[in-house]
Amino acid sequence: MVWNKPNNNKPDFDPWGNKDSKSKNCSDNKHEKKTTVLDIKNFLYNLKNIITKKTDSSNSSKKITYPFSIIIFISFFIWGVSGFYTITEAERGVVTSFGKFSHLVQPGLNWRPVFFNEVKPVNVETVRELATSGIMLTADENVVRVEMNVQYKITNPADYLFSVCYPDDSLRQATDSALRGVIGHSTMDRVLTEGRTLVRSDTQKEIENTIKPYKMGITILDVNFQTARPPEEVKAAFDDAIAARENREQYVREAEAYSNEVKPKANGKAQRILEEAKSYSSRIILQAQGEVARFSKILPEYRIAKKITLKRLYIESMERLLRKNKKIFIDTNNNPMFFFSLDNFFSKIKIPNKNFKDHIKINKNHSPFNKKVKNTNYFPFLSPDNISEQRRINSIRSDLKKIGRE
């Protein structure tokens, strides 16, 4: 305690030390030893207090800095983890550093420093469509309504994002301008009928030439020319014209099909006629040569027996001429008004399957015309019922003879 501390050789203020001053003075040596021991204790005590104060101050500073370090570590961890991102297979990432284009990233897991870099994924595989339509003026000063669909995709993401502010709107304006230019240089019939394919290809070329200087990062895949129709006021007349044109095309196709069907037949028939003509020519030539040879053989006989040869030639000629003609037999000894057809006569007689000449030779003695017999009817096929009809026919025949004589 403080009263136990010595103070510049001053008397000791220990309350227990004044009880017996004599005893204190008597034992000075003993008190000197105790004072030395107390000084060591005081020194150790004071050192302990100093150390204790320093320890308390360091602990208080540690208590202040430890939570702040944890907060900083967690913040850095969250910042680092939040920088990871994924780009899909159909996309490409456009990285900007403080708003300026930096580079492109490929599909997969990537990392960026948050708050410093930004990533904008752009789909480069999807085919996008842009539809446009409108009423336009043609080259022949007609009005037509046209609808068109444009298919495109992004091939350069950086140009698509940074070259033009609104690339889709710019493409729409370029499409409208190109379509109006092509329609303005085409006639209405061409737009509505056979010129649709040409209008489509010309429009695609015009769109590509328009967007090329702007480097929009877009590639035109296809242009579909959907519909083109006239105004409603004249639609009926144009429908009739289109129907007539389609009918004409149908008739042309039918004519071509008929031509393809008839031509082979005609060619075959012509070839057959040529072959028949050649064979006929050969046959006639051979027949003429045969006649010449026959007359050459007959000539010596003609010189020997002129009358007989002439009569034989006459009979053969008449036989050849009358073989296929209708023949009428007339009996000049009786009434000339009665006549009958030899064809009808021989059709009633059963002639065997032999030559007609042989049949006549065999039956010439049995012919009813060889003998004149009274009350013999030479025309058994004529009945009394048809005599009047036969007379009418004979009168017509007589009239014909008179007309021939006149």
Curated annotation (Swiss-Prot):
Residues 1-10 have a biased composition (Low complexity). This is Protein HflK. Belongs to the band 7/mec-2 family. HflK subfamily. The keyword Ribosomal protein does not apply. InterPro entries: Band7/mec-2_domain, Band_7, Band_7/SPFH_dom_sf, HflK. The gene is hflK. The chain crosses the membrane at residues 67-87. GO terms for cellular component: membrane. It comes from Buchnera aphidicola subsp. Acyrthosiphon pisum (strain APS). HflC and HflK could encode or regulate a protease. Keywords: Membrane, Transmembrane, Transmembrane helix. Residues 1-29 are annotated as: Disordered.
